[in-house]
């Protein structure tokens, strides 16, 4: 490392930073009271190695970035938007417009959609007052509510104002029991937690600090044409992909094969690479003093290898690329409070600086382990609620920079704890705006010594960009208002297109905006902008390259292209035929899509030759317009087809519906417990590999009898078999014989027959019309309901003995005499045939006359009963 020959005024202190007798100038009200900077000396034509006379302009090969890799199969959810969190109605009596979070709507949605989460703790507290199964408790009727009946009441409850609205006793007891808790404790505590979560979500929408620094890196390969892109993938971004890419001169970059994958335990937030060359190690030996050479012991690194550092939320790891350019894990560590930044040392291979949310900064190397060098939970300049910390290296191997939202401080790792010097702070020294905060700090030591000094540091805020020299603290060498609509979280210092040329600086916003600056300032001159800044196309500018789509698919594509940018990488491909090489930019979106864009240098003499003052903000110079080719549109169409095959994100979680019909009873719960025990025994037997016996499963469930076959209405055989199958064959046979199994009816039947026979003695003939129209007796079934006697085969003759079966012995003689007077019936076989209605009536009347008993004179005369037909 060679410092410039002529140095600008600087602070030379003896001993460690912050521990010398010289008064500390970092807390002065203004640096103008102590120091003045000389004006930049005009450069002569001979010494003007910087080609600022012809400003460089990068021309994009396409109007927008193109997709390089096919979309991942994992669905992507864009998450919350500002419209979901803000209050839509206008707030009255407010002088200044302010952002108002709609807590009322959010808490109502939370109670409806996530009722199990909101009321689960209350359910456990009030479990003794609810009966979830079976019948209600008889001993605690006043303090125990049946959930099943309560759900029934709530299901039929009508809102107030309805004439059928009512409140049951259970609902009244439930409101008395849960009113004090549900009305005050849940609403107040849940509103506080929800408001805190909404504030965090709103801050995350404004600034997502998790991916500060970028999660996309380029690892050079064995030859200049080959390399690897390292980026996270997956729905949770917990898979680290290593995609090999070939850079062909005059053609688009192509990926080779499928990427290598490493599964991690958390989402990847930052990826940093650093190449280790043999020349750089020899240069370190020549620069370092004698007391630092002990740190440069020969390590396991190959002279031409690369290192890869990955930061997750609570883990950090380092990989090494050896001769075969395959990643080999060196070491991994866990950060309890959460990691916010990781940086690789450009001086000592394998050394890293790690920051945590607790305010601690540690040096970590696979050989020496972890060593804490700084810890301060408070911010540097003024109080700020953010716990974000950032660390980087400087031109000196043992001096680091630590940054937070209020400023940047330099630390001496060899000095006592707490010593240091402020490098940059937000305030009047830098003419900062109100509410301005530091978003990113980066060491620009990888710049070319002929373009920029190796002691520059980049400080980015949400409004401006600052260049600070570590040799002159608190003095911004350059301030420029970038004007990006989204937070500036990505910055890459690119190699110059040709020797002794201006050096491009690429800036990337969280919303996908890209800007390209050209920095110049070698020797003792102040760094300045060599030409106006240039705005590069973003991913949303590639929308015209896709075919016309339906509105729904078009909206999905736009949402995918508008995903936040979480990674940025730049590569200079080898172009032997061209005098100035081009530039390939890679972008990584939060959806996991990788886009690329080629830039070609173009000299434009119409631009201004001398840059204005550092503080002036010039209008952006847009790149020359290009046109889409058929190959570009075909590639976009193919990528779109693959995107449409990706399933959509799962729908928003909806509240489950509960019904009392699906609640289990005590027997069903017992059956479920027995089945669960059997499954547990089966799993244990399978795990041990032993034989499962019947006694291990308990008693077998009682086998239910098979269902009886369905019997027809007119098939007597089927009816008889069905009754016999059910075990009621004897009863069926008795019914067919005209008998009954009830003893009470058997005792009352002769008496009833006597009364009916006396009634029949009043008239010898019964009118059929009166018989059918009169109501039936309640104790005598209708004629069609009486069981029919079994049919007589046609071979049997109609004899008095055959028809007298089932008739008492004292009445058989009368029946024989009556049957003897009847004419023979040849058409109807047997007495099973039903006679005509008039004939049946005359038969019943004759039988009643024959059965009439003689009343004795001693018995009183009874009232004549009416006919029961």
From Swiss-Prot:
GO molecular function, one term: RNA polymerase I core promoter sequence-specific DNA binding
GO-annotated cellular components: fibrillar center; nucleolus; nucleoplasm; RNA polymerase transcription factor SL1 complex
GO biological process: transcription by RNA polymerase I; transcription by RNA polymerase II; transcription initiation at RNA polymerase I promoter
Places the protein is found: Nucleus, Nucleolus
InterPro entries linked: TAF1C (IPR038801), TAF1C_beta-prop (IPR049087), TAF1C_C (IPR049089), TAF1C_HB (IPR049090), WD40/YVTN_repeat-like_dom_sf (IPR015943), WD40_repeat_dom_sf (IPR036322)
Residues carrying Phosphoserine: 848
Modified residues (Phosphothreonine): 834
Composition bias type Polar residues, residue spans: 835-860
Stretches for region Disordered: 605-629, 729-869
Keywords: DNA-binding, Nucleus, Phosphoprotein, Transcription, Transcription regulation
Quaternary organization: Component of the transcription factor SL1/TIF-IB complex, composed of TBP and at least TAF1A, TAF1B, TAF1C and TAF1D. In the complex interacts directly with TBP, TAF1A and TAF1B. Interaction of the SL1/TIF-IB subunits with TBP excludes interaction of TBP with the transcription factor IID (TFIID) subunits. Interacts with MYC and RRN3. Interacts with p53/TP53; the interaction prevents the association of SL1/TIF-IB with UBTF and represses RNA polymerase I transcription.
PANTHER family: TATA BOX-BINDING PROTEIN ASSOCIATED FACTOR RNA POLYMERASE I SUBUNIT C (PTHR15319), TATA BOX-BINDING PROTEIN-ASSOCIATED FACTOR RNA POLYMERASE I SUBUNIT C (PTHR15319:SF1)
Function: Component of the transcription factor SL1/TIF-IB complex, which is involved in the assembly of the PIC (pre-initiation complex) during RNA polymerase I-dependent transcription. The rate of PIC formation probably is primarily dependent on the rate of association of SL1/TIF-IB with the rDNA promoter. SL1/TIF-IB is involved in stabilization of nucleolar transcription factor 1/UBTF on rDNA. Formation of SL1/TIF-IB excludes the association of TBP with TFIID subunits. Recruits RNA polymerase I to the rRNA gene promoter via interaction with RRN3.
Protein name (record): TATA box-binding protein-associated factor RNA polymerase I subunit C
GN (gene name): TAF1C
């Amino acid at each position: 490392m060679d410092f410039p020959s002529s140095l600008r005024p600087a602070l030379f202190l003896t001993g460690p930073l912050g521990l010398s007798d010289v008064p500390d100038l970092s807390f002065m009200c203004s640096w103008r009271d102590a120091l003045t900077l000389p004006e930049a000396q005009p450069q002569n034509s001979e010494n003007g190695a910087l080609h600022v006379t012809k400003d460089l302009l990068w021309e994009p090969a396409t109007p927008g970035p193109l997709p390089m890799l096919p979309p991942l199969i994992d669905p992507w959810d864009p998450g919350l938007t500002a419209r979901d969190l803000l209050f839509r109605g206008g707030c009255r009596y407010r002088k200044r417009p302010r952002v108002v979070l709609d807590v009322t709507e959010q808490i109502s949605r939370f109670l409806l959609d996530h009722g199990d989460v909101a009321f689960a703790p209350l359910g456990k507290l009030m479990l003794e007052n609810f009966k979830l199964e079976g019948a209600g408790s008889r001993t605690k009727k006043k303090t125990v509510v049946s959930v099943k009946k309560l759900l029934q009441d709530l299901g039929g409850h009508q809102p107030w104002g309805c004439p059928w609205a009512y409140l049951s006793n259970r609902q009244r007891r439930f409101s008395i029991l849960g009113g004090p808790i549900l009305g005050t404790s849940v609403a107040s505590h849940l509103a506080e937690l929800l408001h805190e979560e909404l504030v965090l979500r709103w801050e995350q929408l404004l600034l997502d600090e998790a991916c500060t620094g970028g999660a996309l890196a380029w690892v050079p390969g064995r030859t200049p044409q080959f390399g690897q892109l390292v980026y996270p993938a997956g729905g949770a971004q917990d898979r680290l992909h290593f995609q090999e890419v070939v850079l062909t001169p005059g053609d688009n970059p192509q990926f080779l094969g499928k990427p290598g994958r490493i599964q991690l335990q958390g989402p990847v937030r930052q990826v940093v690479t650093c190449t280790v060359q043999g020349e750089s190690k020899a240069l370190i030996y020549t620069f370092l003093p004698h007391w630092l050479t002990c740190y440069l012991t020969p390590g396991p690194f190959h002279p031409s290898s690369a290192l890869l550092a990955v930061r997750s939320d609570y883990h950090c790891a380092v990989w090494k690329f050896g001769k075969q350019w395959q990643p080999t894990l060196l070491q991994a560590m866990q950060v309890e409070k959460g990691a916010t930044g990781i940086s690789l040392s450009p001086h000592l291979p394998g050394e890293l600086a790690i920051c945590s949310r607790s305010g601690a900064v540690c040096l970590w190397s696979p050989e020496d382990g972890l060593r804490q060098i700084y810890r301060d939970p408070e911010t540097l300049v003024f109080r700020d609620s953010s716990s974000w910390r950032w660390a980087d290296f400087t031109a000196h191997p043992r001096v680091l920079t630590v940054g937070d939202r209020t400023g940047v401080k330099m630390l001496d790792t060899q000095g006592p704890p707490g010593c240091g010097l402020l490098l940059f702070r937000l305030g009047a020294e830098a003419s900062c705006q109100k509410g301005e905060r530091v978003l990113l700090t980066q060491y620009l030591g990888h710049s070319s010594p002929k373009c920029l000094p190796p002691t520059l540091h980049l400080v980015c805020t949400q409004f401006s960009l600052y260049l600070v020299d570590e040799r002159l603290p608190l003095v911004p060498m350059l301030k420029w208002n970038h004007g990006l609509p989204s937070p500036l979280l990505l910055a890459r210092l690119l190699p110059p297109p040709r020797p002794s040329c201006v050096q491009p600086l690429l800036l990337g916003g969280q919303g996908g905006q890209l800007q390209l600056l050209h920095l110049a300032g070698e020797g003792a001159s102040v760094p300045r902008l060599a030409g106006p800044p240039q705005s590069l196309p973003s991913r949303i500018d590639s929308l015209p390259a896709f075919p016309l789509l339906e509105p729904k698919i078009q909206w999905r594509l736009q949402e995918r292209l508008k995903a936040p940018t979480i990674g940025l990488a730049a590569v200079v491909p080898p172009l032997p035929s061209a005098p100035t090489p081009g530039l390939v930019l890679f972008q990584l979106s939060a959806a996991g899509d990788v886009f690329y864009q080629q830039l070609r240098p173009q000299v434009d003499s119409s631009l201004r030759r001398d840059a204005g003052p550092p503080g002036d903000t010039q209008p952006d110079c847009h790149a020359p317009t290009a046109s889409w080719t058929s190959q570009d549109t075909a590639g976009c169409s193919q990528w779109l087809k693959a995107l449409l095959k990706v399933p959509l994100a799962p729908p928003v979680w909806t509240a489950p519906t509960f019904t009392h019909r699906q609640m289990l009873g005590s027997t069903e719960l017992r059956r479920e417990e027995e089945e669960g025990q059997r499954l547990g025994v089966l799993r244990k037997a399978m795990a041990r590999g032993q034989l499962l016996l019947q006694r291990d499963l308990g008693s077998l469930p009682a086998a239910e009898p098979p269902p009886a076959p369905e019997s027809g209405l007119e098939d007597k055989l089927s009816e008889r078999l069905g009754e016999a199958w059910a075990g009621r064959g004897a009863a069926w046979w008795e019914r067919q014989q005209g008998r009954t199994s009830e003893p009470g009816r058997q005792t009352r039947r002769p008496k009833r027959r006597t009364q009916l026979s006396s009634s029949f003695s009043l008239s010898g003939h019964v009118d059929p019309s009166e018989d059918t129209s009169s109501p039936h007796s309640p104790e005598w079934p209708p004629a069609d309901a009486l069981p029919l006697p079994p049919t007589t085969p046609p071979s049997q003759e109609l004899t008095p003995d055959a028809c007298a079966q089932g008739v008492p012995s004292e009445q058989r003689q009368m029946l024989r005499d009556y049957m003897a007077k009847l004419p023979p019936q040849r058409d109807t076989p047997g007495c099973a045939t039903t006679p005509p209605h008039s004939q049946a009536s005359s038969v019943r009347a004759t039988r009643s006359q024959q059965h009439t008993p003689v009343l004795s004179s001693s018995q009183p005369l009874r009232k004549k009963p009416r006919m029961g037909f």
